[in-house]
Curated annotation (Swiss-Prot):
Name used for this protein in its record: Bifunctional protein PyrR
UniProt similarity note: Belongs to the purine/pyrimidine phosphoribosyltransferase family. PyrR subfamily.
Example of a GO biological process term: DNA-templated transcription termination
Origin species: Staphylococcus aureus (strain bovine RF122 / ET3-1)
Chemical reaction(s) catalysed: UMP + diphosphate = 5-phospho-alpha-D-ribose 1-diphosphate + uracil
UniProt-listed NCBIfam families: PRK05205.1-2, PRK05205.1-4, PRK05205.1-5
């Protein structure tokens, strides 16, 4: 199986910086801004974007995580679900501008699950979506507001994102 490196470490760093600037422009600064990374790699990307925004604005914005495990539509819901546990952040996200962050946008089902988790717990003013890679093949009417790189793929190909925080390297690879 052949592999192609689509983004290396430097490209990922530049992309995270660009997305941070785009989010600041979209929100006209940092007021009421919240970042929520979808576990697991979205969490690391959210932290990187938070760090870039801090470098740019000298202000640290609230950042947390979304665990979509119990909101997926391809598994049965577990009765022990505590929906409040789906979002891990130290501030209320009601009446805030929430940016969901993930590594790859594919069918849209992960994003739909994250929207369910958010809206079950709060009522943000606005919700945006930032992804490192958009590979197409949507099954739901969902699109990202901030895209690092559009990578047209076939359904047979896989897009793998490697992040240093968990994979000891930074790369986006198509197999």
């Amino acid at each position: 199986m052949s592999e192609r490196i689509i983004m290396d470490d430097a490209a990922i760093q530049r992309t995270v910086t660009r997305i941070a600037h785009e989010i600041l422009e979209y929100n006209k600064g940092t007021d009421n801004l919240i970042l929520l990374g979808i576990k697991t790699r979205g969490e690391y990307l959210a932290n990187r974007i938070q760090d870039k925004i801090h470098q740019i604005e000298q202000q640290r914005i609230p950042t947390g995580t979304i665990d979509i495990t119990y909101f997926r539509d391809d598994i049965e819901h577990m009765s022990s679900l505590t929906t409040k546990d789906a979002i891990d952040i130290d501030t209320d996200i009601t009446d805030k501008v929430v940016i969901i962050i993930d590594d790859v946008l594919y069918t849209g089902r992960t994003v739909r699950a994250s929207l369910d988790a958010i809206l079950l717990n709060a009522r943000p003013i606005k919700i945006g979506l930032a992804v490192l890679v958009d590979r197409g093949h949507r099954e739901l009417p969902i699109r990202a507001d901030f895209v690092g790189k559009n990578i047209p793929t076939s359904k047979e190909e896989t897009v793998s994102v490697y992040l240093e925080e968990m994979d000891q390297r930074n790369a986006v690879i198509i197999k």
